[in-house]
């Protein structure tokens, strides 16, 4: 425990906040090109084939991003937009691909939560 005179001399050192999405460099989203599109399995106790893509960003970083929603049209050389946000059961996946932006199509036949999946409002009859 420091004395008051020590605090007057030095002061408290504030700890720097560590970014959860360092490759974005303080930007809300970044553009990149898919280098690999594949599926992977989650940590225990979950079981699935999660769709992920390895993306080379415009700032030179190469990151792993999650492709949310049912079905996708991504392949190698697809241009995508990524945002921050990790996937809890996939180690090393700290980014999400934005659906409905650039080369990534929105989710087809999506009725609820459409804005998160780039789905247009369905036509009323």
UniProtKB/Swiss-Prot annotation:
Q: Which GO terms describe its biological process?
A: translation
GO molecular-function terms, A-Z:
rRNA binding; structural constituent of ribosome; tRNA binding
Origin, by domain of life? Bacteria
Residues with the 3-methylthioaspartic acid modification: 89
Cellular compartments per GO CC: small ribosomal subunit
For this UniProt record, the keywords arranged alphabetically read as follows:
Methylation, Ribonucleoprotein, Ribosomal protein, RNA-binding, rRNA-binding, tRNA-binding
**PROSITE patterns of this UniProt entry?**
RIBOSOMAL_S12
For this protein, the record's CDD domains field holds: Ribosomal_S12 (cd03368)
Q: Name one Pfam family in it.
A: Ribosom_S12_S23
Concerning PANTHER family, the annotation shows: 30S RIBOSOMAL PROTEIN S12 FAMILY MEMBER
- Give the family from UniProt: Belongs to the universal ribosomal protein uS12 family.
Give the record's subunit note. Part of the 30S ribosomal subunit. Contacts proteins S8 and S17. May interact with IF1 in the 30S initiation complex.
**Protein name from the UniProt record:** Small ribosomal subunit protein uS12
State the organism named in the record.
Clostridium botulinum (strain Eklund 17B / Type B)
Please spell out the taxonomic lineage of the organism that makes this protein. Bacteria, Bacillati, Bacillota, Clostridia, Eubacteriales
Q: Which gene encodes it?
A: rpsL
């Amino acid at each position: 425990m420091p004395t008051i005179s020590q605090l007057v001399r030095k002061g408290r050192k504030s700890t720097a906040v560590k970014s959860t999405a360092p490759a974005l460099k303080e930007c809300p989203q970044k553009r990149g090109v898919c280098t690999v599109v594949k599926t992977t399995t989650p940590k225990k106790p979950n079981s699935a084939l999660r769709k992920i893509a390895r993306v080379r960003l415009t700032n030179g970083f190469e990151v792993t991003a999650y492709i949310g929603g049912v079905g996708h049209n991504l392949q190698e050389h697809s241009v995508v937009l990524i945002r921050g946000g990790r996937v809890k059961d996939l180690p090393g996946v700290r980014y999400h691909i934005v659906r409905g932006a650039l080369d990534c199509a929105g989710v087809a036949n999506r009725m609820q939560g459409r804005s998160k999946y780039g789905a247009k409002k369905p036509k009323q009859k």
